[in-house]
């Protein structure tokens, strides 16, 4: 016995041009334009964010990293001076550098 398909008759098959009518409708073309605009804005935002990240990163490397290195060096020098003073038996006194 053959299986009976529901909606497969002449009237149940639908219009063969329904996809063409839907894809050519105004709402679909507006959606495509909106999607294209969203992609364009996303690309511009990504490009400008990358530029800002590059500027921030290079500024950090040029200005902040040498400062951190110098502060660490100064802390090491102070620690060595305190160790030497304690080995010599003198009470540790705060040294005033740069005056």
From Swiss-Prot:
Family: Belongs to the Tom22 family.
UniProt keyword annotations, A-Z: Membrane, Mitochondrion, Mitochondrion outer membrane, Protein transport, Receptor, Translocation, Transmembrane, Transmembrane helix, Transport
Quaternary structure and partners: Forms part of the preprotein translocase complex of the outer mitochondrial membrane (TOM complex) which consists of at least 6 different proteins (TOM5, TOM6, TOM7, TOM20, TOM22/TOM9 and TOM40).
Residues annotated as transmembrane: 52-69
Alphabetized GO MF terms: protein-transporting ATPase activity
Originating species: Arabidopsis thaliana (Mouse-ear cress)
KW Membrane (keyword) present: yes
Described purpose of this protein according to its UniProt entry: Central component of the receptor complex responsible for the recognition and translocation of cytosolically synthesized mitochondrial preproteins. Together with TOM20 functions as the transit peptide receptor at the surface of the mitochondrion outer membrane and facilitates the movement of preproteins into the translocation pore.
Keyword Transmembrane helix: yes
Protein's name in the database: Mitochondrial import receptor subunit TOM9-2
Membrane topology term: Single-pass type II membrane protein
Top-level taxon of origin: Eukaryota
Any Gene Ontology CC annotation: plastid
Coiled-coil segments: none
UniProt note on tissues of expression: Expressed in young cotyledons, roots, flowers and leaves.
Alphabetized PANTHER family for the sequence: MITOCHONDRIAL IMPORT RECEPTOR SUBUNIT TOM9-2 (PTHR46867:SF4)
InterPro entries: Tom22 (IPR005683), Tom22_pln (IPR017411)
Upper lineage: Eukaryota, Viridiplantae, Streptophyta, Embryophyta, Tracheophyta
GO biological process, one term: protein targeting to mitochondrion
Subcellular localization: Mitochondrion outer membrane
Pfam families reported in the protein's UniProt record: Tom22 (PF04281)
Topological domain spans for side Cytoplasmic: 2-51
Mitochondrial intermembrane side: 70-99
